[in-house]
Amino acid sequence: MRAAVGLMLSHGAGGMEPALSRPDYEQSALHHSCLLVLLRGVGPSRARVLQRAFEKVRRVNHIRVNDSSGHPRSIWIRFVHDHPVEHNDWGDFQTHRRLLGLVTIGKFDSQIELNELCRQHESLKVRYGSTLYESRAIFFGPDEQPLETIGEVLGPPAAGGRRLQDEFTTPSNFKAQAFFYREQDSCADLESRIGDFASALFWVLESRRLERSREKADKVSLLLAPFEKRDFVGLDMESRNNRKRCVGRVMKNLADLSLQAGLVDDALSLYHNANETLRSVGDSLWVGATEEGLCAASAMLLYPQMRETETLHRNSSLQEAGTSPLKNTPEKWRASDATKKISASDATANNVDSNQPQQRVTSNSSSCSSVSSLVTTATNSSASDTPTTSSSSTSTISAAPIPGHQRNGDLPGNILKAEEISNYYRKAIINYSKYRHAATIETEAALKASRICIEQNRPLDVAMFLQNILYINLSMSEAERVKRFEVITDLYQQIGYQRKAAFFQRLAALKHVQQGSQAPDWNQSYRLMLGSFTGYRLCLDPLEVIENAAGWPALQIDLVQTLITAARRLGHSALATRHMTFLLQTQWDNMSPTEQSEMAVQLQNLSAQCEGSPVPLVLENGTVIPPANLTDLPYCIDLQVKDLPAHLRPQRIKVAKADSGPFLFTPIHFNSVDRRDKKKDKNKIAFQWVQNDLSEVTVRLRNPLPFELPVTDMRLLTNGVVFESLPQTLVLQPHVPTYVALHGTPIETGQLDLQGYSTHTLGVKSNCRLKHMRGRSFPPNYVVDVIPALPRISVKTSLPQTATFSNMNSADIVVTSASLTLYNGESSSCTITITNESATLPLEHLEFSINSNVEQELQQKIFRIDEEAIKAHLPVPPQGTIEIIVDVFAEADFVCPQPPASLHSAAAPGDYGASSLTHYSSVSTSGHASLPSRVGSPHHRRNEPQNSSFRSTISGGPPSLAALTLHPGGGGGVGPSSLGSQYNQHIEAQVRFKYSGGDALTAGYCRQCAVSFNLELLPSVQITSWDVLPAEVASQFYLVLDISNLTAQEMSLNYTDTKNILIEAKESCRVPIPVDRCSLEKVVAARAAEVAENLERELCFRTQLLSFNDALSKLCSIHIAERVKIKWLLTGTDIQGIASLRGIVLSQSMVDLTAVSPLEWAISFQDTLVQPHNEIVCTVGQRSLLSIQLANQSLQPLRNLVLSIKFYQDYLNGMENYNLETRVAISGPNRIAIPLLEKQEQKEHTCSVIFFTPGRFKASIECTSNPQKQSEQPSSLLTRSCPAEAESVGQSVMFSSSYDEQQAHVWKFIPPIEVTVVEQ
Amino acid sequence: MAFCIAVIGKDNAPLYLTTSDMEQELELQYHVNAALDVVEEKCLIGKGAPESKELYLGLLYSTENHKIYGFVTNTRVKFIVVIDSSNVALRENEVRAIFRNLHLLYTDAICNPFYIPGESLTSKKFDRAVQKLMSGTA
């Protein structure tokens, strides 16, 4: 017996019998209990009506039938589309592999087509005839005529069917039952007919089962697997072991039939018995089959929900809507439910629970209700085949609980436990592995075991079974090998082993395109490779890959490269370019520089066929490939949003006014700081851009590749308002940072969102967004406000431009410059032409201001613009122009700031040959100053004779005329020894324009630009010294000026309306100018102003003495400046100007001469009124009366006046002799004190004069006010402080106090009286 | 003795991977990557009983040419060793010894105060020691 077994195995190893051609990968454990039916479409047509029929047929996968003894059976049907004939040969080994039924569906339009459909049906019957029980044909014919169709609707459907059958006839050799339907028929009865068909199959199966069960043990024949036939040739079949083998195999076959017939309990018992019998004789192959059968039967009872999985899977595959995330959720739910059921089953097995059976009964009752109608119909239809059943039997079926062993709610005792199933499968697989011909059976068993373990939520066992599949030695074709990998992939994905699934997906993909393959399927390879992305932490969105980078870069790079190869072989250039871009974007940091260069070159070559673009790529199967961008090619180091040029920068009109306020408080700064922080958080740009104006963003780029990188069509990426980007083309050198300016124009107003830039490099267009740039601290975007369009202007001037740059602030808004050279006092003008360059916007608002490096007041004198003339020209239409005239006057100080008193003090002592005017000045100064010195100086007493001789020298001729004649000749010697040379003065100024128009003006925006002015002031005329001398009449005085010509040319000087003088270059001359004296009204007004000022200053406790003098001095200065205008002209040129005397400083003595004297003189000599320049003659020894009348013309009383009369002789050589005691005698007092001279009061004094010697004498009559009584000042202050004083009294007191506080004043009778004494 | 030795971080990113045959490095990386599924599953099983958890995970899976063993530390760092299938003389005790030595080398390497956990192991000393361990002379 052992030798026989060895011989059998030896024959098996020979491999003479063909094995199953390929495994049935879709098979599951529960398919052991199904009746196998081939569902095939025949004919050329694949209309939608056939698809609907297919679905209706497939829906009938479960029926309930009553057997001959009245017990209900649960029958399942499995529909397949393809079934190799070789699988039928294994029907004895496992009966579920036997094809039992055949259903064909076809469509015909004519009799010939119908005959062809019948022929195809018959050929299929012949092919599977050895195992086929029953077959059906479903034919769809053409529709009836419209009239007949209407008639048919009224009639019964059966009649309609018959009519179609009457029209067409099947061939004579066609013996199957055919169902005819119209093309538009709803096929309402198709499902019931298929149910009848299934029932027919069941009854045939049942008869086979009963026949098998009735066989006697001693008469059974040996059942064989296809490859076992040769092994048993010549053996003694009657031996004990062979007899047991025959009985065991028959028992196993009967168990298979019982399982298919719905008798699970019987099947379990039979499997166990067969297992024991076959194991005793060492029949390993059939022992494995019994073990597999046990697992299948147990799975039927434990996991009936796996059938639902099958249904769900089919629907999912049909709809092609299944996705990995969606599949995972039901998976978890199903696993959880399975675990719960396993626990419940265990609990039920251990204890009988009364509640559990009720729940089961309820569930099964609902299931019975759902199929009750079908069962009823089936029963009615098959009445001829089964014993008669009554209606009460039908109602019993509806209410009956689970049949058989489950009536008590308990599982059979011999069922396998959940953990035992995997063990039994493992043992079965081990038994199968002993036979090479059973490799397909082994593979299918492993797959079934995997599916069971998936249901049991035991992934490690699944992994073990799947891994063992690879060890099975199968002579498979490449297509079958790929199919195996795909099935393994799917199962791995179900247990969540993404990496394993990806591994096998990659293997399947590589198998498709293996070397030596006759027809490489790159499409499948690509699809599988794409499906394996999840396992390697890849997805099609490059941004997700970058964010979730989790290592394994080498694998990712290799996978993407393989994908690129597949895409290229497919001929899909766009796809290859897209994936290569994806590779560079996601794996740039993980590649070496050499690899980076190689990939870049490859990308360049790929994109030469089809360019890459940043739009999603939709494949034919509906897959969407997201866009990939070369964000880091080139590498962006920095990106800065640039403000507009200064002269085009928008500013707020109102804000500017607010900013000009004089006070800035601290809280404003805090708010400003907070606002700044807030802006920083929002990535808000502080400045604004202007609609329709060119804007700029500066980008610093670096080329990380070792070769030149051309970048074309580089633009800004924006969001928000419409933005028109200008393309930029550049070539980046390797590893060198390059600055690029990207320009664009915002078309709308609002907020512009700058997100990055777009590039076109290496043949790929990329959107490089800031938020996707890693390793840099870029904000996600920049937000810029775009304000409405502002007009644009161009500015030109009539003066030449200058190349020098301005040192003033805000120099960046200067758009043009003008340079001008003027002599001090010269006038000129500049015409500024403003053109509105805007095409559509008028210039509606234009204001200007002038800034310079000199003081505001001086600036206003130098530059003048007529504002009204400008406003009259507004608005300026587009392309229009406006002219602005700026008048420029070279304002300067012509008066030398040297003190005149010191000048005269220095000049007077050594100058005895001066003119009479100079002499008068010396007399005035020395007369006042020499009063104290005369008393203490014996020098003057010794010089008395000289004065007398001097006075007699000038006794004849007009003194002023002589002086004027002498002056030009001695001008050079009279002036100061050295003149301070005046330097050139340089003035920088900016004429700033703020302009606006259109909507921007409404919004409160404007622009600002400036014209830079360079004004050079050359020195022209300078007054080095000045003095005030009394004139011939009392209403005038002489202003004596020393004028220097500081230019290099001859100057003609008009110092009065009628007088002219020429001054050579760098020369100076002395000029006397008669000027009217300042009127008393002005003096009164000045004093009134002084009083008002004093009232204010009382609160500040300031002294008023100096302020009054200052006021009066200013008054006289203004008086002189207003009346004296010195016009100068450079001889031979057109250059001319006016020299102003503004700023001239007058001393107190000068002020007394300038202002009109408050005293009015009336002097008579010998009863004759003395007139100016009258000849007065008297005789020696004769008494002459001298009468003097004083009148106070001022508004205030004069106090402490001293009237003095002195006679002296003037030698006209600078000497005056006052010691005339021996020549003149005065009877009566020559010094009279007047304590008080009220307003408009007159005083008269008369005395007699006797001359002892003949000669020429002069009389000096003067009135002096002395502030010697200063003790009254405190009382005056006290009086002023008294609150009880009335206003008028207070005013009067203040007048007095102010007068007392004044300095000493000397008023003289001008000119001095000249008396000629003659002999009788 | 070993084809490949890999150190995988807690986030399943490779910290160190070395092979004896450079031409097969990519293929071995694929195998190591696929083995992580089984490693994760075995780590998950031991969650319920931490006191009975063993660091050595045993044979993860085998192919025609390779056997892949796993080891996991208390800090969830995984060690993967790929051994030739034809080396039938290699016993399980020897594989355990390899992992024990590898664990010692790894702890020495991460004692470097300048090593940042989670980054690649670039220690030359560690690399040399692993090479010796791989060639069987350790």
Swiss-Prot record, chain A:
One of its GO terms (biological process) is Golgi vesicle transport. Residues 362-400 have a biased composition (Low complexity). Keywords: Cytoplasm, Golgi apparatus, Phosphoprotein. It is found in: Cytoplasm; Golgi apparatus. Disruption phenotype: Failure of both actomyosin ring constriction and furrow ingression in male meiotic cells. One of its GO terms (cellular component) is trans-Golgi network. It comes from the Eukaryota. Its main location: cytoplasm. The modification Phosphothreonine is found at residue 329. The modification Phosphoserine is found at residues 317, 672. This is Protein brunelleschi. It comes from Drosophila melanogaster. The gene is brun.
